[in-house]
Amino acid sequence: MPVASAPAVQISTATETEINEHAPTSLTVFRFADNPRILVLDFASLHEQGKMLNRVAAFVEKAGLPHDRVLTDGELDAAIRAQGDTVETFYLGHDYAAASLARFFALADSEQIMLDPAEQWLRALLQQEGWFASGVAAGLISLPAAGSDPRITASARAAILRHELSHGEFFSNPEYAEYVYKFWLTELTEDERGAVRDFLAKEGYDARVEELMFNEMQAYLMFTRDPTFFTPDMAAMTHERLATLQARFLAGMPAGWLRNVLASYQSAALAR
């Protein structure tokens, strides 16, 4: 008798506003309307989000942890405790490229790591979407429901979503990723790049991973406007210098939805 395949994961297409205003009672998967190569996992709780994605976070970007193998359950628990965190607080939002996710699952299989049911569900979603094929340019992001933690207010949820969507664009749009890389090298001074690395290292990112540094640079400096998460002094930068960098970034930015977002910030600033 043939084995029945798992039912397809239902995915709804939604705008940023629709995703932000959604109040999940269980995990909901969205395809971002402005860029269908971005998938958004909208979790009802930080615990649910952490169980699915914390091991991926450790593998891809967390400082002090190996990026060439997948942690066991015991190693992951110890790493989270060593940071003074819990499953819920390890990350508030997640973002990963299709290629990084494919590598994670391939290594987990080769190392015979026992994955959680939530991680196996994620594997099925990615298989459904064809993300394990070579050369796929796509991004997976996540966020928790407003009220799932005292820190996750409505404004914090909106800030997390905007930040993570910019990562989704970076992962899914090679032209944008190349633009960010060139901007990092040519528009920020060496001292400014060092200050950004220092800020990100304090946030727990592995500062040795250069692509991670310039990807986070664009997300924080250009698209994170909530002072709870970022202010220019956190990267040893003045407000005036940050405004100059934002204007220069906008001037050369590829056309598209994310450019429109940055332009709207500039328009609002001029109107004040």
Mark where each language-model region is.
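Short, solvent-exposed segments of well-ordered alpha helices
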Residues: 9-12, 17, 21, 152, ...
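Short catalytic/ligand-binding loop motif for oxyanion handling, primarily in non-cytosolic enzymes
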Residues: 23, 39, 49, 169, ...
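Metalloprotease/metallohydrolase-associated module, dominated by Zn2+-dependent proteases
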Residues: 24, 28, 33-36, 41, ...
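Active-site scaffold of zinc-dependent metalloenzymes
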Residues: 80-162
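Active-site recognition of the HExxH zinc-binding catalytic motif
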Residues: 159-172
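Short acidic alpha-helical/loop segments enriched in Asp/Glu that coordinate divalent cations
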Residues: 174-187
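N-terminal low-structure segments adjacent to metalloprotease catalytic domains
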Residues: 1-102, 255-272
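Short, flexible loop/turn elements at secondary-structure junctions
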Residues: 45, 144-147, 166, 174, ...
